[in-house]
Amino acid sequence: MPRVPRSSLVRLAAPPDAVAAAAVERLGARPAGDGTYEVAAPPDEQPAIGLTLRLTPADDEGGGGTDVAITSTGEIDIPFFGWWFQPFVFIAHRRARAYAIETLRAALDGRHSPPPRKTVVGLPPVAFSPEQATFLATASAAVAVVSFAAALFGQLSGPISDSFGASDATIGVALALTRLGALFALFAIAIADRRGRRTSILVGVVGSAVVCALSALAPNLATFTAAQVLQRGLVGTTGTVAFLAVVEEAPEGARAYAASMLALAGGFGFSFSVVTLPLADMAPWTWRLPFALGGATILLAPAIARHLRETARYTALAARTDVVRGRVQDVFERHRRRFVLLGIVAFLTSVFSAPSSQFMNKYLTDIRGFSNTDIALFRTVTTAVPGLVGVLLGGRLAEARGRRPVAGIALALAAASQMIFFLSGGVVLWTMSAAAIFLAGAGGIALGTLDAELFPTEVRSTSNAMLYVVGVVGSASGLLLAGGLSDRLGGIGRSVALTGIGSFLVALIVVPMLPESAARSLDDVSPTQTTAEHDEYGPDP
C-alpha cells in the first residue's frame, strides 16, 4: 500500500527557535536540516505514525510567528482488507498531527503536555507484527467467504421451501438436519490440534465452495439438505479454527480485538448474502443464484492459501516432544469445569440463536408481510451499523473491562431484545432488532474469546470442536422446538421467543462463573500441559 503523506499547517505565536526547542523537548524531534524536524514513529502503535515538522518564519505584520507544516506518514499494509482500515488510519493521522500541535502550544504557553491520545476504535490497541497482521487478514478473508455460504440457507429458507413445496415444520426439520454436519466438523476441527490450523481452514474454504455449487444444482429438498449437512460442517470448521487461530496468534492485549476483526469479516460475508436476497424475487428458481456465487468463491482459495501460514504458537508446540496434542481426556481431566460451563452457555444460547436467525426472514414474510426486497432493506438498516459498532465496541470493552461482564450483560440484554422483536411490530420491530444485533455483537466477541483462551494450545481445537457440537445440538433442539410449536402457539414469532428464556438466564447466571482472562497472558490463562510427571505448569486451575 503506498505511503501517502498527510499534512496540516498551523501558525504559532512564537519564533522558530522557540518552536524548535519545544518540538525537541516535548515531541522528541530531531533536526533534519533546513528548518525541518523529524519525530520517529512509535514502535508500539499501529499504524506507526512518524511526523515531519517544517518551520518557517510567519509572513505577518507583527513578525515573530512561525508557520508549522506537519506531515504524517505511516500505513497498515495487509492483504484483502487494507481498504477497510483506511478511514481509521486517516483518523489516526489527524489525531497524531493535532496532538503534536497541541503539545507545541502547551510547551510555548508553559503548560503540561496534553494526555496521550487514545487509540482509534477499529485500530489495534497494540502493534501487530507484519506476519500477525497478514495472518489475521487472511483468516478473516477465509471466514468472510464461508460466512456468505453459511447464511444462504437461513436467508433463503422461504423461497427454498416454496420451490420444493415444504411446510414450516418440514423446512425446520431440514434446517435441524444440517446440524449433523457437526459430526464432520468435530473431526475436522479437532484434527487442527494434530495437523495444524492452516490445513483445517483451507479444507473448509475449498469444500464449502464445492458444496455450495452442488446445492445450487440440487433437484429436490432431500438432496439439497444432504449437501447443506456437509456445508454446515465445512463452514463450522473454517469459522471455529480460524477464530482459535487469530486469538492464538494475536499479541498480548489484542486477543479480543483480533476476534472482533474476524467477526466483522464474518458479518461482511453474512451481509453480502442479504444483498443477494432480491435475486430470489425474480423467479421461483432464482434462489439458486446466490448458491452459484458461493461456488464461485473457490477462485479465492489460491490467494488465501498463499498468504495463510501456520500460527507461531502451534508451530512451536508441534516441535516439542513432551506434549501430547489433541487428547480428548485431557479436556475433561484438566479443564472439566471450564468445559462444562462453556458447554452450558453454548447449548442454551444456540437453542435461541439458531431459530432466531434461521426463522427471522420467514417471520418477517409470513407474519409481518415483508417481501424479500423489504427484508434486504430491513436487515441492512438493522444489522450493518449496529453490528459493526457492537463488534468494535465489544472487542474494545472486553480488553478494557473484562470478558465476563461484557459477555454476561450484553448477551442477557440481547436475548431480551430479540424476544421482544419476535413478539412486536411497527417501530419496536426495527429498534429491537438493531439493539439485539448491537448487543449480541458485543457479547459474542467477549464470550467467543473466552472459548479460545480457556484451553491450552494442545487441546484448544479439540475442546472447541466438542463445544461446537454442543452448540449444534442446541441449535437443532431450538429449531425443532420453534418449528414444532409454531402452529400450537399461533405463529413462528411466539415459538422462537419462547426459546430465548434459557439464553437470557444463562447469560446472567453461568457466564459470571467463568474465569476472567483479560489483562493476562495466554500462557498464564491456559498453560501448556507437559507429559512429565512433575512439570513446571501443573494442572490448569
Question: What is the meaning of each model-derived region?
Answer:
Residues 134-168, 353-361, 478:
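Extracytoplasmic
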Residues 153-158, 336-388:
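Extracytoplasmic gate region of multi-pass secondary transporters
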Residues 165, 196, 217-222, 251, ...:
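Helix-breaking motifs and short loop linkers at transmembrane-helix boundaries and internal kinks
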Residues 176-190, 381-393:
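Central cavity-lining transmembrane alpha-helices of secondary-active solute carriers
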Residues 199-214, 405-420:
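Structural signature of the two symmetry-related core transmembrane helices
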Residues 220-228, 428-434:
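Short hydrophobic/alpha-helical segments at membrane-entry points of transmembrane helices
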Residues 227-264:
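Cytoplasmic helix-loop-helix junction between adjacent transmembrane helices
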